[in-house]
């Protein structure tokens, strides 16, 4: 292990040494702790990767499933899909780390400590604002066929998946994170698209209750896009 002190030095001392001492592939960076992780598909086997845990609660995965794989900065949910896991959408249980030679789900480790704290902080922030603002569903168009696919934005993970898709000019149907689809799949009917999850009115076209202009749930401190950089700068100001 890179640090032999009583505490793992990562920003503001993320984890104690004994919490990580039996984990495989531990590496301590300037503002993160990195460990070996993976996800198992019954068809493709184990996809191995490296998980970085940041004090902000952000989780970032660099895939090493094959020597030529260049997938990095994946959310756990995106890595779960990339690995070919058949029962997706349960990344806390499906993505694992090696502890004492055994595969242990992330949900049973200390590695989600700051992620969970961040989620609770966002919930408290929303409650303090009256919990009146939510994130409605958004659509992202395929660069190949032009069909629009629905993204839910109810959690930080879901917001990050949509954020990444919006920032990718070459995004296509096969990149859809929730289901394996192709351009052959029909898009939602127009009559269905009007329902986007507004708590005030089911067919709302956008109001102060469902349109967010930036919060801790949908902006990311490690993202370098101008929108996130501006939000992070304003929060620190």
Swiss-Prot record:
InterPro entries: Developmental_reg_ULTRAPETALA, SAND-like_dom_sf, SAND_dom, ULT1/2_SAND, ULT1/2_Znf. Expressed at low levels in seedlings, roots, shoots, leaves, stems, inflorescences, pollen, flowers and siliques, with highest levels dividing tissues including inflorescence. A zinc finger (CW-type) spans 133-191. Putative transcription factor that acts as a key negative regulator of cell accumulation in shoot and floral meristems. Negatively regulates the size of the WUSCHEL (WUS)-expressing organizing center in inflorescence meristems. May act by down-regulating expression of WUS. Acts as an antirepressor that counteracts EMF1 action through modulation of trimethylated 'Lys-4' on histone H3 (H3K4me3) marks on target gene loci (including genes involved in salt stress response and flower development). It holds the Pfam family zf_ULT1. GO terms for molecular function: DNA binding; zinc ion binding. Disruption phenotype: Delayed flowering and higher floral organs number with extra petals and sepals. Increased H3K27me3 marks but decreased H3K4me3 marks on target gene loci. Plants missing both EMF1 and ULT1 have rescued normal H3K27me3 marks and H3K4me3 marks. Plants lacking both CRC and ULT1 exhibit strong floral meristem (FM) indeterminacy with reiterations of extra floral whorls in the center of the flower associated with reduced AGAMOUS and SUPERMAN levels. Changing residue 83 to F: In ult1-1; induces enlargement of inflorescence and floral meristems, production of supernumerary flowers and floral organs, and a delay in floral meristem termination. GO terms for biological process: epigenetic regulation of gene expression; negative regulation of flower development; regulation of flower development; regulation of response to salt stress. This is Protein ULTRAPETALA 1. PANTHER family: PROTEIN ULTRAPETALA 1. Keywords: Cytoplasm, Developmental protein, DNA-binding, Metal-binding, Nucleus, Transcription, Transcription regulation, Zinc, Zinc-finger.
């Amino acid at each position: 292990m890179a640090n032999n002190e009583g505490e793992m030095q990562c920003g503001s001392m993320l984890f104690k040494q004994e919490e990580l001492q039996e984990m495989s592939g531990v590496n301590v960076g300037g503002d993160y702790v990195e460990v070996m992780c993976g996800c198992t598909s019954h068809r493709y086997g184990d996809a191995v990767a490296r998980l970085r845990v940041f004090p902000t609660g952000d989780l970032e995965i660099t895939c090493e499933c094959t020597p030529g794989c260049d997938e990095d900065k994946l959310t756990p949910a995106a890595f779960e899909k990339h690995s070919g896991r058949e029962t997706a959408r349960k990344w806390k249980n499906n993505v694992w780390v090696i502890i004492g030679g055994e595969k242990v789900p992330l949900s049973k480790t200390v590695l989600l400590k700051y992620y969970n704290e961040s989620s609770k902080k966002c919930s408290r922030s929303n409650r303090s604002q009256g919990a009146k603002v939510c994130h409605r569903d958004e659509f992202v168009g395929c660069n190949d066929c032009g069909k629009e696919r629905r993204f839910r934005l109810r959690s930080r993970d879901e917001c990050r998946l949509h954020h990444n898709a919006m920032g990718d000019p070459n995004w296509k149907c096969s990149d859809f994170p929730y289901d394996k689809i192709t351009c052959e799949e029909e898009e939602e009917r127009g009559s269905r698209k009007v329902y986007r999850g507004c708590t005030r009115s089911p067919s709302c076209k956008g109001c102060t209750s469902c349109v967010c202009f930036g919060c801790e749930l949908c902006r990311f401190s490690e993202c370098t896009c101008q929108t996130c950089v501006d939000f992070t700068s304003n929060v620190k100001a």
